[in-house]
Each structure stands twice: as structure tokens, then as C-alpha cells.
């Protein structure tokens, strides 16, 4: 066994399909060029997590010190560790160092990227890096603790990278984007929320609507398929219209907020072809599709209403091992 290993995974934006993907609709998701890195070092006592964003947390190894209270921040990592142990990896004391270029709790997949990078680095430390299929399965155990009923789309894109068409229970399909001359603007509302709370709220509204909600879900699935075709054909104008329609559907099920709508309309007023929330909603981030020559105006438009904003490129590479 090596003394240490390091791995990274990309963040993501959901172009269309968040929430609806939980119940079988299509989602289009893209990895972005911001990554989260995890370094695992053996030694010490128990498990220690060190992160500039999440702080420092420690806990006994699974099966030791069962009476000790474990920080909720560490619980997903422990779930991943248990899954690794079930696959034959030895459980040893170690430190987890997290370095992230992905804002946490912002809908950009930081949690999934962390679970993926941790699972890959821990398995690599043992000299046997997980396959992509096993990496997905192990990381999902952590996401279940973090989010309750994750669709799996965040973990899939963190493992694979690129742009994917994702439907729960089916193999993801790689999309070859034909878009040129456009870029995504990402603006963070600065409002943190628990994904699990928003997912449960949206599902409760859908259930309360009964049969009417089936039409909303059908519409979401249809526009996701239209988005796929627009991306492949390079039809940015149509993709923007689809993003706007997707925002309306998400709002109808209670996923939006005043902070989100403010950023959406500021982007649209600044020339965005389309703008919508990405991720769970209730806060987190908004994405806008801009022509390259107009994105600076978009950035200026959201300065006062966001905690941070940046342009995002598509990351073709998913999870990877890294040298020290």
C-alpha cells in the first residue's frame, strides 16, 4: 500500500432536466473546467477531514468507537469507506485533504466530485484504483447519505466528464457538442441549501398535483430531447429558448426563488440566449448561455446580485489520478 494518493473530479452544470431526472425524465449535463482534488494520506488515528471550505472534522474508523458522534460532514465519506471495505479494501487510519475550485452547496456537483475523488484516491493508495463502474457505485453510497435520493447524474458526470444525456436506469450517452461562439456564465446566488430538502419539496408538490404533474414531466422530457438535438446541431438560439422553458417548468414545481429569478432576468436582460437555475434550486447557481462577445456584459449584470460569477468551459476529462 502506498502512503498517499491524489485524485480529482470535475464540477458540473445541468443544462436541462434537474429534478425531473429523479422520476425518469432525460437530463443533459456537462462537466465544467473547475475541479475538486482529494489527497488521501495513511496514518494517524481514525479518519480526519481537512478542507478550507468544510473545516476540520475527525471520527473513529467504522466499527471502532461506535458511541462517538460523527459530524454530518464526515458521514458521506464514511459511507464511501464502508463500500470500499465491502469490496475488499482494508480500512486504515487516514487523512482526507480536500482542495476545491467548485463552490460548495451551489448546485455545481461539489459533493459528487468529492465522493468520486475520495473513492478513487483511497483505492489508488491501496494499489488498485477503482474501475469507472465501481467508482460510480461506491461514490453513490456517499451521495445517498448527503442527498437522500440522488438521481446519479452528478456522480456520472464526475466520473466520465464531457457532455452526457442521462436517464436514470439507462447507460449515459455521450453528446458531441456542435456549439461554437457561445459560452456559459455561472452566477452563484450565495444562498446555501440542502439538496435533499429541495428534492423532497419538489416531489411533494408533484405528488400533490397528481395527474397534472405527469404533463409537466412529459414536457420536461421532451424539451430535454430537443436540447440534445440543439447541442449536437450547434443551434444556440434554440438551446437558449429551451433553457428558458426549462426554468418555467422548474419554477412550477417550487424549485426557484427570488434570488434565482433575479439573476435569471438580469442575464436575459443583458443578452443571454437563455438562463435558468442549475442543480437543486432555492439558491445555488444560475447559468446563462451567451454569445462570446456579450458575456462580459452578462458578468457586469450579475455583480450586484451574486456572490461570485465566472465563465465555464466544458471539461472533456472526468475523474483522474494526479501526481504530487
From Swiss-Prot:
Cofactor section: Mg(2+)
Active site (record annotation): 154 (proton acceptor)
InterPro entries in the record: GHMP_kinase_C_dom, GHMP_kinase_C_sf, GHMP_kinase_N_dom, Mev_gal_kin, Mevalonate_kinase_arc, Ribosomal_Su5_D2-typ_SF, Ribsml_uS5_D2-typ_fold_subgr
Binding site for ATP: 103-113
DNA damage is among the record's keywords: no
Keyword hit for Metal-binding: no
Keywords, in A-Z order: ATP-binding, Cytoplasm, Isoprene biosynthesis, Kinase, Lipid biosynthesis, Lipid metabolism, Magnesium, Nucleotide-binding, Transferase
EC number(s) per entry: 2.7.1.36
Record-linked Gene3D superfamilies: 3.30.230.10, GHMP kinase, C-terminal domain
Gene Ontology terms describing biological process: isopentenyl diphosphate biosynthetic process, mevalonate pathway
Known pathway: Isoprenoid biosynthesis; isopentenyl diphosphate biosynthesis via mevalonate pathway; isopentenyl diphosphate from (R)-mevalonate: step 1/3
Location within or outside the cell: Cytoplasm
Catalyzed reaction equations: (R)-mevalonate + ATP = (R)-5-phosphomevalonate + ADP + H(+)
One Gene Ontology term of the molecular function aspect: mevalonate kinase activity
Primary location class: cytoplasm
Gene Ontology CC, one term: cytosol
UniProt subunit comment: Homodimer.
NCBIfam families: mevalon_kin
Family statement: Belongs to the GHMP kinase family. Mevalonate kinase subfamily.
Known function: Catalyzes the phosphorylation of (R)-mevalonate (MVA) to (R)-mevalonate 5-phosphate (MVAP). Functions in the mevalonate (MVA) pathway leading to isopentenyl diphosphate (IPP), a key precursor for the biosynthesis of isoprenoid compounds such as archaeal membrane lipids.
Protein name: Mevalonate kinase
Gene source species: Aeropyrum pernix (strain ATCC 700893 / DSM 11879 / JCM 9820 / NBRC 100138 / K1)
High-level lineage: Archaea, Thermoproteota, Thermoprotei, Desulfurococcales, Desulfurococcaceae
